[in-house]
Design a protein with these regions (language model features):
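Beta1-alpha1 glycine-rich phosphate/pyrophosphate-binding loop at the start
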Residues: 131-190
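Flavin-dependent oxidoreductase catalytic cores
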Residues: 1-132, 136, 140-151, 159
Length: 190
């Protein structure tokens, strides 16, 4: 049904670790490994779910679309690009469209990027590039062209993040705001 489909892949209005309580209850009743799902993209939440015995494994779907290096980054103690549970990826798939991710512009375009890399295609270097706007798109572009180039980002606001940052002020969009610290760390690496 539509209502159960909407909850099966919990959107940002649902709490982190949406189904962890169910997994924990099941784990106490069975003698086989239990995997839990649903809004476990925060590394601390995922690790705690296994360490406290609520589940034997955590399944990561959308978090790996947001950051394919999620597991390796967590193992190295690095900041991950957090899935904000906006379900852009899910909505597109349900419509038969190309997979997309609001926080990872490469998602759904991996083949294009891999093919360009395989062919040795590189961006021109030695350029002075101006990027207007310090939202996710502008920052992602700036990062993509920064190697060998001088990139200057122009942003009218005092803080980077664009409308993406402001979305966190809306009720039930707190994950967008939670993503602002990784966004600021990303900016620092440019």
């Amino acid at each position: 049904s539509v209502p159960s489909g909407a909850v099966m892949i919990p959107p940002m209005a649902m709490p982190d670790a949406t189904f962890l309580g169910f997994a924990s209850a099941i784990r106490r009743l069975v003698s086989v490994p239990v995997i839990t799902v649903g809004r476990l993209g925060d590394p601390e939440t995922a690790i705690r779910a296994v360490e406290d015995g609520s589940a034997d494994f955590v399944a990561l779907g959308r978090p790996l679309l947001a950051d394919p290096a999620w597991v390796n980054k967590v193992l190295r103690g690095e900041t991950v690009r957090m899935c904000i549970a906006c379900n852009t990826c899910v909505d597109g798939m349900r419509l038969g469209e190309r997979l997309q991710c609001l926080v990872n512009p490469v998602t759904g375009r991996e083949r294009v990027f891999a093919e360009a890399e395989r062919q040795g295609k590189t961006l021109p270097s030695g350029l002075r590039i101006a990027v207007v706007g310090a939202g996710p798109a502008g920052l992602s572009y700036a990062a993509a062209v920064s190697k060998g180039n001088t990139v200057t980002i122009f942003e009218k606001a005092a803080v980077a993040g664009g409308a993406f940052r402001l979305a966190g002020l809306a009720p039930k969009f707190q994950e967008v705001e939670a993503n602002s610290m990784p966004l600021l760390r990303f900016i620092d690496r440019l």
